[in-house]
């Protein structure tokens, strides 16, 4: 049986832009309201579509942007680097098992996570780690599938424990400022694997330490 790293390598080897070439729709929407620039970490960011969108936007606005991409798959990381070079953008990549991170404190201005789904133990580690690694006033932004997504069968893991409960998710950020928080139905068309009505959690959270 393939291990998780090789499963993701195989998935990313099969097609280009398996989750689409454009950034996630919520990431595009929230940047109309929030300026996301500075040192930015993309978690489980695959081929880099969201980070590259943010990097290009910051460049167009004359803002500094440093992009770090962490993912399980070396194939995805290599493709992300290639796409960055094609667009004249800079991207730092790291092959990272998110269950085994020594999170650096106060390191990032922003963390983004779009459809980054993990087992319950790793979910806890990641959400706690995100808060640790963001600076005071830093932003955590993203879109995830909620536990109700199992009913929809339009993308994401097929095990409920890999999905997110909104109340449990919020418990990690009870001292922080919710700029945007939405739980409900959206239509998504992002590559072959995310198609149709979906039940998501959207968030933009400003960390207050």
Residue ranges of each PLM-predicted region?
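Short alpha-helix
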Residues: 161-182
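A short SAM/SAH-binding and catalytic strip from SAM-dependent methyltransferases
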Residues: 109-123
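A short glycine-rich, Lys/Arg-flanked "PGG" loop and its adjoining helix->strand segment in the class I
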Residues: 124-136
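Conserved class I S-adenosyl-L-methionine
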Residues: 1-35, 148
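Core SAM-dependent methyltransferase catalytic element
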Residues: 189-209
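Conserved beta-strand signature within the Rossmann-like core of class I S-adenosyl-L-methionine
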Residues: 137-145
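Class I SAM-dependent methyltransferase SAM/SAH-binding core
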Residues: 39-41, 48-99
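A short acidic, Gly/Pro-enriched loop at the edge of an enzyme's catalytic core
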Residues: 101-110
């Amino acid at each position: 049986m393939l291990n998780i790293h090789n499963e993701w390598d195989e998935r990313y080897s099969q097609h280009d832009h398996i989750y689409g070439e454009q950034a996630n729709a919520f990431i595009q929407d929230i940047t109309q309201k929030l300026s996301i620039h500075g040192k930015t970490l993309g978690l489980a960011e695959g081929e880099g579509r969201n980070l590259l969108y943010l990097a290009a936007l910051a460049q167009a606005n004359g803002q500094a942007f440093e992009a770090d991409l962490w993912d399980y798959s070396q194939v995805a990381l290599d493709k992300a680097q290639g796409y960055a070079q094609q667009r004249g953008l800079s991207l730092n990549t790291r092959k990272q098992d998110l269950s085994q991170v020594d999170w650096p404190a106060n390191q990032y201005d922003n963390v983004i996570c779009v459809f980054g789904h993990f087992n319950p133990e790793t979910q806890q580690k990641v959400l706690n780690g995100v808060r640790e690694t963001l600076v005071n006033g830093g932003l955590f932004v993203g879109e995830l599938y909620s536990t109700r997504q199992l009913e929809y069968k339009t993308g994401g893991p097929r095990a409920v424990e890999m999905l997110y409960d909104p109340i449990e998710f919020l418990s990690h950020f009870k001292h922080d400022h919710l700029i945007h928080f939405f739980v409900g139905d959206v239509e998504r068309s992002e590559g072959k694997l995310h198609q149709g009505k979906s039940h998501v959690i959207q968030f933009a959270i400003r960390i207050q330490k």
